[in-house]
Amino acid sequence: MKLLFPIFASLMLQYQVNTEFIGLRRCLMGLGRCRDHCNVDEKEIQKCKMKKCCVGPKVVKLIKNYLQYGTPNVLNEDVQEMLKPAKNSSAVIQRKHILSVLPQIKSTSFFANTNFVIIPNATPMNSATISTMTPGQITYTATSTKSNTKESRDSATASPPPAPPPPNILPTPSLELEEAEEQ
């Protein structure tokens, strides 16, 4: 659920997508409805051509909770302050502020705190990636280029094979009995 929720929320925050199912117009990725007037408990989020995109209180709460608790490192301080429960504030001012900040939220990446290494003037290489998966253990990944693979093949044929390990002789009950009989 944690992995799907950022995708779900980012889709909800994208521009309006009109879908029609049996003549019923929907907006906000199917979570809102296009109507002339919103009900008392609903909020107007976007415009559906000539109508209003109305969203119920559960969807509004879902979006606010995700923005408040799910993505604190992505949002700037202005948005975080706006999402905190405010007293004596007008819902119209908050809605206008949310709509003005949405393009900024959309432009920020969910991977803003991830470190990426960018190498300028890098030459493309053919590479093979090998990963081993063992349940309950750490996964190790080895990457080798085509030239490294060729060198390792040549060096493997030039070097002698490794010596076999010494045989481990474990005392067995039958051997102990035979030694005892001989004495």
Curated annotation (Swiss-Prot):
Keywords: Antibiotic, Antimicrobial, Defensin, Disulfide bond, Secreted, Signal. GO terms for biological process: defense response to bacterium. It comes from the Eukaryota. Expressed specifically in testis. Residues 141-183 are annotated as: Disordered. It is found in: Secreted. Residues 1-19 form the signal peptide. GO terms for cellular component: extracellular region. This is Beta-defensin 129. It comes from Homo sapiens. The lineage of its organism: Eukaryota, Metazoa, Chordata, Craniata, Vertebrata. The gene is DEFB129.
